[in-house]
Design a protein with these regions (language model features):
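Short loop segments and helix-boundary regions at transmembrane helix junctions
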Residues: 58-67, 88-153, 159-160, 194-196, ...
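Cytosolic-side transmembrane-helix boundaries in multi-pass membrane proteins
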Residues: 1-3, 9, 206, 213-220, ...
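Transmembrane helix-bundle core of multi-pass membrane transporters
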Residues: 123-194, 247, 338, 343-347
Length: 348
């Protein structure tokens, strides 16, 4: 991240601003006081879950970047379940909403894995296109059949009942979605590194042909990894509805799924490393408004910093083992063959 911060400083300097001041405001806006910490942690909660949507399939050898689609469909499922029946306005009803959100995301991303395994469709392209499809479906239902008549200039679904909402952690402005994200990262890390099925997933991701030779069901494992990742992103959408927005509206389409891609790559697809990286990126997002107020730069400029971090990660992957690689010793020169001496025959 130091390289990304340095490049961001150059970017600020080119705009005739002080890089040192920008770095200072980044830290203050993200982690300068308890209020900043709360803002950073709240922003980090959905990033943990959307990053898992990339990290878990990546461990199975798939590059899935469609977490945004699973997130918006998860939010739509959470807000749409009360249209089908009235869930009890208590913790059990909230669990039903979150389960519906997770199932919606799981099915959507599992479709990506199935297309890859049974139709040979590239998962990167299909997941991205399905994300756009999910956003279109979301807009159709929110602005059409599920629109609340009371929502005027900002179409949304009906507001969830108070008993179905997820409150904040006592004494803080942080909602319980942060706990969901941390627990999901910890549990999936334990599953990935300490269970037989997690080990099989890593084998498939490392060498699919070798996994097939030893009898591992590669197709089922890959689709299952996609379903787990999709469930995490769908849960993120459900938590955004139940804990933040109270309904499904256009605010869900905020790019959290795409930022989760950056978080996962910076964390090297390690579920445990996702936690601190998500907090860091959440802090960058929280510091954007402070940069805008103090330095008169767009708050979206922090996305440039995120982009630099992503580019450096990709560059390090591409150049690993190639830059400054130790030179192989030159082979010793082969001595030239000596002519065989001709022995003169003795005169008879």
């Amino acid at each position: 991240m130091s390289g990304a911060l340095l490049l961001f400083g150059v970017f600020i300097w080119v705009g005739a601003k002080s890089p040192v001041e920008a770095w200072s405001l980044l830290f203050k806006g993200a982690f300068g006081d308890w209020f900043s910490w709360q803002n950073s942690l709240q922003r980090a909660a959905p990033l943990m879950l959307t990053a898992l949507c990339v990290a878990i399939p990546a461990r199975a050898g798939l590059t899935v970047i469609g977490g945004e689609g699973a997130l918006v469909l998860g939010g739509l499922a959470c807000a749409g379940l009360p249209y089908l029946f009235a869930p009890p306005a208590n913790g059990f009803g909230t669990a039903m909403l979150l389960l519906a959100a997770a199932l919606a995301g799981a099915v959507w991303i599992a479709l990506v894995g199935a297309l890859r395994q049974y139709r040979g469709v590239n998962e990167t392209i299909s997941s991205l296109l399905l994300a756009y499809t999910a956003i279109a479906l979301f807009k159709h239902f929110v602005e059409g059949p599920m629109r609340d008549p009371a929502s005027l200039n900002k179409p949304s679904t009906r507001t969830l009942a108070d008993g179905l909402l997820i409150g904040g952690i006592s004494g803080t402005d942080i909602h319980w979605a942060l706990v969901f994200g941390i627990v999901a990262c910890v549990i999936l890390g334990l599953w990935l590194f300490f269970t037989t099925s997690g080990f099989a997933t890593r084998i498939v991701g490392g060498n699919a042909r070798a996994a097939l030779l030893v009898g591992l069901p590669g197709a089922r494992i890959m689709v299952g990894a996609c379903a787990i990742g999709g469930a995490c992103a769908g849960l993120a959408g459900g938590l955004e509805v139940a804990a933040v927005h109270t309904n499904a509206n256009a605010s869900l389409i905020a790019g959290l799924g795409y930022t989760g891609i950056l978080v996962s790559f910076v964390a090297r697809h390690n579920p445990w490393a996702v936690i601190p990286v998500a907090v860091l990126f959440g802090g960058f997002g929280a510091a954007g408004s402070l940069l805008q107020r103090r330095m008169d730069v767009p708050d979206a400029s922090v996305m440039v910093l995120q982009g630099f971090a992503f580019l450096l990660i990709l560059a390090s992957e591409a150049l690993r083992g190639k830059l400054f690689a130790p030179r192989a010793p030159k082979p010793a020169p082969t001595p030239a063959p000596q002519p065989t001496p001709v022995v003169a025959e003795a005169a008879s």
